[in-house]
Amino acid sequence: MFHRRKRPYNTRNYGHDDKKFKSQYIDIMPDFSPSGLLELESNNKEGIALKHVEPQDAISPDNYMDMLGLEARDRTMYELVIYRKNDKDKGPWKRYDLNGRSCYLVGRELGHSLDTDLDDRTEIVVADIGIPEETSSKQHCVIQFRNVRGILKCYVMDLDSSNGTCLNNVVIPGARYIELRSGDVLTLSEFEEDNDYELIFMNV
């Protein structure tokens, strides 16, 4: 039976890597106040409580561009391009348009349960962007668009996943918004041998 690799709680040593991302941290941290927890309880999908609660300044790219009154030809478009590492010569495995919503949950989607007692049952998928990697978590990370002082910015946040989220081959801290820039590459484990897919954030 397959065993997912897990690290003990709070044992990652980010060291210099953590400092690398300090300039990309946003001032506003996730809301874990009582009111935020109450909102979290009502935030569920398929009966599963979602870890991520959107911030007050969440906005979709489409709504932001509408707010500015921009014509289609003048708008910046956002997408997530996913490649299977061993099949890059075949082109992208999937493309996701990121313009219509303010956030996208990324997580495991295998089509079957990892529990051997539930092999015949269909896996419950809560992710908006599903990745068929057994070592990734159901709620692995989230891509979040925000209106930060009038400027549209996109962030990634690791949702305290089992094996971490890497941005350009560096493990990012959990539960912190890290700004994404066009061409950034995300992988869903800090262990290179676990990563069959690369997620590339693009804006054009």
Curated annotation (Swiss-Prot):
It is found in: Cytoplasm; Nucleus. Keywords: Cytoplasm, mRNA processing, mRNA splicing, Nucleus. Residues 104-172 form the FHA domain. InterPro entries: Cell_Proc_Reg/RNA_Proc, FHA_dom, SMAD_FHA_dom_sf. One of its GO terms (molecular function) is mRNA binding. GO terms for cellular component: cytoplasm; nucleus; RES complex; spliceosomal complex; U2 snRNP. It comes from the Eukaryota. One of its GO terms (biological process) is mRNA splicing, via spliceosome. Present with 1470 molecules/cell in log phase SD medium. Required for efficient splicing and pre-mRNA nuclear retention. Belongs to the pre-mRNA retention and splicing (RES) complex composed of at least BUD13, IST3 and PML1. This is Pre-mRNA leakage protein 1. It comes from Saccharomyces cerevisiae (strain ATCC 204508 / S288c). The gene is PML1.
